[in-house]
Amino acid sequence: MNPLAKRIIPCLDIKEGRVVKGVNFLGLRDAGDPVEVARRYNEEGADEIAFLDITATHERRDTMCDIVRAVAKEVFIPLTVGGGIRKLEDMYTLLNAGCDKVSINSSAIKNPSLIDEGAKRFGSQCIVVAIDAKSRADKSGWNVYINGGRIDTGIDLLEWTKEVYERGAGEILLTSMDADGTKAGYDCEQLQTLSKLVDIPLIASGGAGTMEHIKEAFLSGADAALAATIFHYKEIDIMDLKRYLRSEGIEVRL
């Protein structure tokens, strides 16, 4: 794959082994089956798939590993899994089951050495650090939030981004909490700022509503665009999106 090609990544929330936020594909026998949904996205031209495990039980790991094994047998594009990864053993179990990358968020803030240890053990290319950021009230910048956006850490986004990079993260998945769910576009100022700060791939998340929004994210320095609703509800077809991006001079894999 062209390393300069921009990537389109549908994100699926998984709860107790099922896809939540219904996926509106015609002809799917079971829209809650992660394997079936992943297979369809693979056929439709997604470059990668991200799974976020939102199950709040300790049984989550076994269920998620079963899903990863089943998906990896059927789907040959990279698979990233996040949610509840707190230690190296969790990373090992998921990577061993067949996922390509693991995504850590709150656990990286609580134990930053997890980034170094994961990168050293499995390679930076396997470690994605997800960051949820929100504008400060005085608009002087952004703070990092954890626990699904419920807790303001008081940590500055730029400082944390630099630390994550220096500790060996291979990619950063940046969610703008201000833009998330608005369908009014990604936070392009945030993307521009971070893309100048570090030279690892930046995945934009939060705010996509149109093809133009995704183009703007790429022009603002994002290497990949992640979205859920617009793809799940077929508001945007991935191949149509890629043809549009290519017509606008943005390199994508068709």
Curated annotation (Swiss-Prot):
Coiled coil: none annotated. InterPro entries: Aldolase_TIM (IPR013785), His_biosynth (IPR006062), HisF (IPR004651), IGPS_HisA/HisF (IPR050064), RibuloseP-bd_barrel (IPR011060). Its main location: cytoplasm. Pathway: Amino-acid biosynthesis; L-histidine biosynthesis; L-histidine from 5-phospho-alpha-D-ribose 1-diphosphate: step 5/9. Its EC number is 4.3.2.10. One of its GO terms (cellular component) is cytoplasm. It catalyses: 5-[(5-phospho-1-deoxy-D-ribulos-1-ylimino)methylamino]-1-(5-phospho-beta-D-ribosyl)imidazole-4-carboxamide + L-glutamine = D-erythro-1-(imidazol-4-yl)glycerol 3-phosphate + 5-amino-1-(5-phospho-beta-D-ribosyl)imidazole-4-carboxamide + L-glutamate + H(+). One of its GO terms (molecular function) is lyase activity. Keywords: Amino-acid biosynthesis, Cytoplasm, Histidine biosynthesis, Lyase. The active site is at residues 13, 132. NCBIfam families: hisF (TIGR00735). Belongs to the HisA/HisF family. Heterodimer of HisH and HisF. This is Imidazole glycerol phosphate synthase subunit HisF. It comes from Wolinella succinogenes (strain ATCC 29543 / DSM 1740 / CCUG 13145 / JCM 31913 / LMG 7466 / NCTC 11488 / FDC 602W).
